[in-house]
Amino acid sequence: MKHVIITGTSRGIGLEMVKLFAKAGNKVLALSRNTEPVEGLKLKNVHTISCDITQEDSLEKVVEYIKSEWKHVDVLINNAGAILNKPFLKSSVEEFKNIYNTNVFGVVNIIQKTLPLMPATGHVVNISSMGGVQGSVKFAGLSAYSSSKGALITLTELLAEEYKENGHSFNVLALGAVQTEMLEEAFPGYKPPMLAIEMAEYIVDFSLNGQKYYNGKLLQVANSTP
């Protein structure tokens, strides 16, 4: 049984991961600003906290819960994300900041809070996008989103290097097109071949076993692009 934190659990891949981890008997801490979807499942061993990862005081509730109930964290999956599909010259600096606050600084925030509570075998899995991979197909209008996901990839590589003597593992998955509400927002009407549950199954397995084979690695998880 592992102690697993997942961010961005109100819908899509995050919600499916909560179900899968719980079904396998793991303890799950589901973090999202909207906790109702997870609470409605009434799953054993799943605890929800209404949390905004961009706010440090919001994460203090997470730290307090871990210290009082779990004592440690085995797996952290940074799945929460924000997207903006808007032409570059029409995107304000404030809009760029909002995307980076969730996709980069929010991830930094929660890793800094939870890493001291991880054993040497702990695994941090960051969820990026194929749009953030150098040399991959890019789409106009996603300059804020894709560049933030590129930053997340580099951050993961740097953390793996910095903590390689401690035993902690950091990996990043660049996801391709998946049938989620978030993709529908960016590409209205497009129906990718992969379902959220299918991608969730892959991420769950990787988060539990991937650190045996990878550290500081970018894995491209995609069989198509929009």
Segments predicted by a language model, with ranges:
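The beta1-alpha1 cofactor-binding region of Rossmann-like NAD(H)/NADP(H)-dependent oxidoreductases
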Residues: 51-61, 93
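Conserved NAD(P)H cofactor-binding loop of Rossmann-fold oxidoreductase domains
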Residues: 79-85
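N-terminal Rossmann NAD(P)H-binding glycine-rich loop of SDR-like oxidoreductase domains
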Residues: 10, 18
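C-terminal helical subdomain
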Residues: 165, 172-173, 188-226
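Conserved glycine-rich Rossmann-like NAD(P)H-binding loop of the short-chain dehydrogenase/reductase
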Residues: 24-39
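Catalytic loop of short-chain dehydrogenase/reductase
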Residues: 125-151, 156-157, 161-164
